[in-house]
Amino acid sequence: MIYIYEKKINLKMDQFLKENSRLIKNNNILLENETLLLIVDVQEKLIKNIKDYQLIIFNIKKLIDTCKLLNVRIAITEQNPLKLGKTLDAIIENNEYSYFEKMEFSCSKNMNFIKYISEYNFKNIIVCGIETHICILQTCIDLLQKDLNILIPRDAMGSRHEIDNDTAFIRLALSGAVASTTESLICELCKTSSRKEFKEVSKILKTSF
């Protein structure tokens, strides 16, 4: 009886592993040279309608500062910039990014963006910005279908309405995106307090809103 019971458990576990292979595969510690920070549509005419937008900008800047420090590449997308304005100066500053303009909601419909991902052989993409339930959702779903690991820091993304943001976040997590936070991802990229950059990373972490 014990053998039969254990066999049933093993069969259920095998079934679980098969059905959730994407979730398990995505549960890897980030490597800097395989990771891209993607900042989606943080534009002048969009941002101020977003719930808690100042906190979102604050956390995106923390991710930017960390990625610059650790040599993680950064890409920015802009949705119809002629109509919706350019990316906020607070995000751009004097930093060098890869820029991609788009009309489609999903960044993945931009062939130049897809070529960029392929060129640098990214395996992990941290996606932040706005809006969670439109451009971020469609981008992440498309990227997941390309077998990429997608990480979504909940405190660095948002929508105009809380219900849209929360519902999209749940769908993304169920679809295989890895739910996380800004601080967690910063520490995951840094990995150890023994590295030379940790002192500066620690300052970023201690910065309060």
List the predicted regions and their residue ranges.
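N-terminal amphipathic/basic-hydrophobic helices that include classical n-h-c signal peptides
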Residues: 1-12
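Acidic/proline-rich low-complexity IDRs
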Residues: 10-12, 16, 54
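Active-site-adjacent betaalpha module
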Residues: 14-36, 69-72, 82-209
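Short beta-strand segments at enzyme active-site cores
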Residues: 38-40, 74-79
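Short acidic, Gly/Ser-rich segments with clustered Asp/Glu that frequently serve as metal-coordination loops
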Residues: 44-48
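Short, solvent-exposed loop/turn segments at secondary-structure boundaries
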Residues: 49-53, 163-164
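A short alpha/beta connector and helix-capping loop motif
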Residues: 51-67, 72-75
